[in-house]
A protein has these predicted regions:
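Intrinsic disorder/low-complexity polar-acidic segments
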Residues: 30, 34-172
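Feature for intrinsically disordered/low-complexity regulatory segments and propeptides
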Residues: 1-35
Length: 172
């Protein structure tokens, strides 16, 4: 027994998931689904995948967003991913990504390449922060549309082999 440590566990199997501090606030998996409904709008998200590792220490939920961008006629899909840990090893992370998350590898790729995310620790204010995230993500959706415009501009620029060699030489 530790005075300042507590265990999280799965109530369906009574399996401990991790040791946490007294200020740790649990974010239930159901809250991830509710977040999508609130942030995107009920019936707007197209649910893609949900998964977990181990006994449920880490979970993710992903949804395809309804509006794709087109770059020279090719659709670029956008996904919203909610990931959470239940063992004290991390917090809640919510991100936009063009990567369709279906497993641990694609989740890690999405996290490592995304600059469009919010992250929160499991403190008593985590639910307030998740609410603020909805506003932040609303702004991010606008930025994603702007990103599509920039992609189309870049896709129409002609680049020669010499341009590429010069660029690499100047930037390596």
């Amino acid at each position: 027994k530790c005075d300042n440590a507590f265990a999280t566990y799965r109530t369906d199997y009574n399996i401990p998931l991790g040791v946490v501090k007294s200020k740790y606030t649990i974010v239930q998996n159901n809250d991830a689904f509710n977040f999508f409904d609130d942030a995107i709008g009920k019936n707007s998200a197209i649910w893609q995948t949900a998964g977990f590792w181990g006994n449920g220490e880490r979970i993710f939920v992903s949804a395809k967003l309804p509006n794709n961008i087109l770059v020279k006629g090719d659709p670029v899909e956008n996904y919203l991913v909610f990931t959470n840990t239940h063992d004290g090893s991390g917090g809640v992370k919510i991100l936009f990504t063009p990567i369709r998350v279906i497993c641990k590898n694609t989740l890690n790729a999405a996290i490592s390449t995304s600059s469009n995310y919010v992250s929160f620790r499991h403190t008593t204010s985590v639910y307030n922060k998740i609410s603020v995230a909805q506003e932040i993500l609303g702004i991010s959706k606008i930025k994603y549309e702007e990103f599509g415009q920039y992609c189309n501009l870049l896709a129409n620029i002609k680049v020669t082999d010499e341009d590429v060699i010069q660029f690499i030489g100047e930037n390596l």
